[in-house]
Amino acid sequence: MASLLLEHLENKAAVDEAIRGTKNRVLVLRFGRASDTACLQQDDILARCERELSKMARLCLVEAAQVPIYCQYFDISLIPATIFFVNGQHMKVDYGTPDHTKFIGAFRTKQDFIDLVEVIYRGARHGKSIVNCPIEKSHIPKYDLIYKDI
């Protein structure tokens, strides 16, 4: 199992520490469930990329049920959801979808993930807080946002 090779954050305090403590690298947080097939596919891609991205990214897995406060804050209702931070700042990405705060679904290829992390890393180094997604539009999962209680 690829997820055994990646760092697991077990609670809110661990997630907070990872966000505050990761300096000069992209922090990638994958929110999901270990039993979900899409999460397992995502974990496999993350594990295969970890060595190549070790100088520019820290990859962590977060069990969504263990940190409900972050799931509520980032409005994580579909999994896997991948969120990016650099030096404690939440990085947003224009995926061509209504939500720029997170990537919903699994990445299709290892290269898609590597390209995205590189663009976020370079954008953050130039002071940007939002970057354009380099992933082909056909590789980005489609979904509709449904707003409750408006």
Please state what every model-predicted region is.
Residues L6-N11, L29-R33, L40-D43, A47-I69, ...:
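Thiol-based oxidoreductase modules, predominantly thioredoxin-like and allied folds used
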Residues S77-I79, F84-S138:
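Non-catalytic, surface beta->alpha helical segment in thiol-disulfide oxidoreductase systems
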Residues H8-V26:
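A short beta-strand-turn-helix
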Residues G32-D36, I45, C60-V67, G96-K102, ...:
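Short amphipathic alpha-helical segments embedded in low-complexity Lys/Glu-rich regions
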Residues G21, V28-F31, T37-Q41, M91-V93:
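A structural signal for the main folded, soluble domain(s) of proteins
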